[in-house]
Amino acid sequence: MVSGYAEILKHSLILDRKFFLWLIKNGKKIINEKNKALLINAIFKSCKIKSTVVCKDEKERNLRMILNFGHTFAHGFEGAKNFSKKLNHGEAVLLGMIVAIDLSNKKKLLSFKEVSLIKKHYKNLKLLTNIKKFFKKNEINKIVNFMKKDKKNVSNKINLILLKKIGQTTKPEQIALKDIEIKKFLNSYYP
């Protein structure tokens, strides 16, 4: 259920603040499958958001790229773990979104208040927030090397979708960082 919830949460964070606030209220029942009606409603809303995006940009040339929020980091995390069961895709996406949220704040795009609200939701649902739980500092190069292989990168820079606020992302290709910048940022998790 965690993997599915990662995608539901992602859709709320990138395009629908009201949906995110609804998830704050109902997320625990959804993730624990305590209320089937809420689960169905969340899946329906999530699919509707994704469908709207895909229909507007079938070739993934612009808007559809926002669906990659958290995934560039996630692919780096999965690759660094050799795509093993130690970190499944949903967990990697949850962790990737948290790292992207922290970077959004560091780049002064996303307020501390919004970051706190998102992290509180993660904590209430016992979702992954700690990169150090899965990776040692010496694995950062491996993570970034996998991130560099992403097909959406431009001009030898890692293309990222970040949050400006809950329900709104940066424009596709607005944030493209050199691998050294990503390494420096990831190193900041290890004092």
Predicted features along the sequence, with ranges:
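Catalytic Zn2+-binding segment of zinc metalloproteases
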Residues: 76-85
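Small-residue-rich helix-loop
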Residues: 90-99
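C-terminal charged capping/lid subdomain of soluble metabolic enzymes
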Residues: 109-191
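Carboxylate- and glycine-rich phosphate/diphosphate-binding segment that chelates Mg2+/Mn2+
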Residues: 1-67
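Active-site His/Glu-centered metal-binding helix of metallohydrolases
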Residues: 69, 73-77
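Short glycine/serine- and small hydrophobic-enriched flexible loop segments
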Residues: 7, 79, 98-106
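Residue-level signal for inorganic ion chemistry
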Residues: 71, 97, 166
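Residue-level recognition of alpha-helical structural elements
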Residues: 35-39, 62, 86-89, 111-114
